[in-house]
Amino acid sequence: MRYTYVRQHDTTDCAAACLAMVCLHYKKEITITRLRDMMGTDLKGTNLTGMEKAAQELGFSTAAVRVDRENFLSEFTTPCIAQVITDEGLAHFVTVFKKTTIKDDGERRRHMLRQEEERKKCADEGKKFKCRDYVIIGDPAKELKKISLDEFYKNFTGVLLLMTPTSEFKAGKQKQGSMVKRFLDLLLPQKKLFFYAILSSVIMTVLGIASSMYNKILMDEILPYGLKSLLVAVILVFSIVSVTSALISMVRQWVLIYLSIKVDIPLMLGYFGHVFKLPMKFFATRKTGEITTRYSDASTIKSVFTSIALSVVMDIVMACATGVILFRMNATLFSISIFTTLLSILLVFIFKQPFKRINEETMQQSAILNSQMIESLRGIETVKCNAEEDRELEALEREYIKSLKISLRSSKISTVQSLISTLITTILGMVTSYVGIMQVLNGEMTLGGYMAFSTLSSYFTNPVSELVSLQMSIQQAQISIKRLTEIMDYESEQDETREYTEMEKIDGDIEFKDVSFRYGSRSPALSHVSFTIPYGKKVALVGSSGSGKSTITKLLLKYYEPESGTISVGGVDLDEYSNASVRRAIAYVPQNVELFSKTIYDNIRISRPEASLDEVKAAAKKADAHEFIRKLPLQYNTYLEEAGNGLSGGEKQRLALARAFLKDANLYILDESTSSLDFGTENTIFDMIYNQLADRSMLIVAHRLSTIRDCDLILVMDHGEIVERGTHEELLEKQGKYYELWSLQQGIFRDKKRGEKPAAPVSAAKVVEDEDDGESITY
């Protein structure tokens, strides 16, 4: 039986890859990227609820069950998905394709008892018990393998997701864009260069074949008859042929380099251009290393299609031309060359799967290693302040050693293939020499003819030998195409075929009406939230961390779409406006300020590229940033380091506020925008906000309640719901959640009953269980 194995692309893909295996078993082909979206995979992985939801959406009837060892041997539908714990202690999914099955309950119990007796007997005799029960699993992180039930149960948690296709399940192949077609579309505008490359290859082939006749003419025509006068002419002609061939080879190389550059620009920039158009959930559910390694995939594809593709064209032309000539020269020797070629092709097919597996492992491990390095460097301050350099280095070392081990296995496979290829070529080359020389000795062939055949035969066999040596690169390109295609097929955040209204300014009330939202398949982040931001009014969102405050800002910026409910601006559904125009109309200061490796001037005017230096200075003064900028050696022309390293948290926030003030929008969203500022600076900025921007709408997310006491409306959030609303004074009078938060910050909170102990905090484990509906987070 052939099992449908699918390897995961990235570290959090295991659930999607397992479901893809089950779908393939039932003749349905669907991409891992599509399945990730359906099951709500994020950086934490996928929970069982999300996977079950995706399976049901595809038309499967599902049942999540927990089984003990005896029940695992009972009859149930396979393939199914099992949850395991990896050796590193991470939750993981594998696909169970086949296993030992004992249908009768009584026989199953007797089987378990017999095994237990055998196990005890082996233990008493000091022997190792050999379990004959087996499981065939597809581990998306490793391979398809058959293992004993004992080995399986070392990692198995007992949780299975059983799946059976219903009448709603539809077999078939998901429509995918062709990366090959995309690449050919890039080559078509370069038809002229491509033609020159092929033409030069053909000319080189002809000249190469002509050069092979040199020895034949020398041995059969000149030496036997002592034609000294002809010798000079022949040497001169073939010297010209050799020089011409070398010059054309140089021109061909230049053409290939130029063609590579012409293809490189639209391919690489096209990839990042597409990535920039993807929705925020794409970035929120992937590590940076997983995205950047696709850039390497694009480079691999380019290399194969430009260099190798043209080499293949030349090799095919050369093999066909020389094949005809060789057959006419000596059919017997040609048959040996054909046999050599067929063995080399067979070798390619034999090593196809080993190379595929090792290439997939290499690319996945490369993404993991890149992500680990990026995270370590980004968090270098945290690493140093906790003196964790050695521990981080150990983590990097572990991943690097894994990469080296994969590389070593890859080298071993390549070496074995190369050795076999060399043996085939050498042994059959010696056979060809023996047969050819015997024919020369028997007078069936001239010495010059044999030498010409030997030279020409290399033109016939070399293309296949080249194919063998390039097999690793070609299969890398195939895997790269698959990985890159899944990204390129990912839908842009906005339908480019639809016409949207362009938002000029926000000049009306903003209304959230019964809005609910969740990230992936997690518990709801917002539940039936309704409120209005009247035009020109200041509205604040307060509440504990994770209560849904920042989620509201992300929905308003159209980073995500509500699961249900509507958001409107001036009575018009927000969905009617283009994403870009909405974001241009809003001045947003996020919690985490991102600064770029540009001048301070360029960093501030990113919100309004056409802004003059005077306008940038005015915005900086509003944000109380002008003074610290003025003290820098180059002031506004000071070039910032990556991510603004070298600036304090408060200085970064002031630059972010300057960006927002420069935009001069009608709606400002301040998400913890002054949390790193001292009280004096914070009060100065908020005085400016309440006075100079009194006519602008504002949504302020704050933990420091003293900054929002003058807001027109304060919304108190808890677990994704608005639990209180009103002005500062009204909420204090209610003595509810807001009063509690205010009292805590003012340092006057006391238990209502003297001597009563504060309530014990909910355990972290309980919180995680509540958030994930009791399901395990899996990677």
Residue ranges and their predicted role:
Residues 236-245, 249, 311-361, 431-445, ...:
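Transmembrane helices of ABC transporter permease
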Residues 1-210, 224, 228-233, 252, ...:
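Membrane-integrated ABC transporters
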Residues 198, 202-213, 243-250, 301-304, ...:
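Hydrophobic alpha-helical transmembrane bundles that constitute the permease/transmembrane domains
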Residues 273-290, 361-409, 481, 499-501, ...:
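Loop segments that connect adjacent transmembrane helices in multi-pass transporters
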Residues 194-248, 255, 327-332, 434, ...:
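Transmembrane helix-loop-helix hairpins at lipid-water interfaces of multipass membrane proteins
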Residues 215-216, 256, 276-321, 378, ...:
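Juxtamembrane loop-to-helix connectors within ABC transporter transmembrane domains
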Residues 117, 123, 497, 503-779:
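ABC-type nucleotide-binding domain
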Residues 365, 369, 381-388, 412, ...:
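Cytosolic ends of transmembrane helices, especially the final helix of ABC transmembrane type-1 domains
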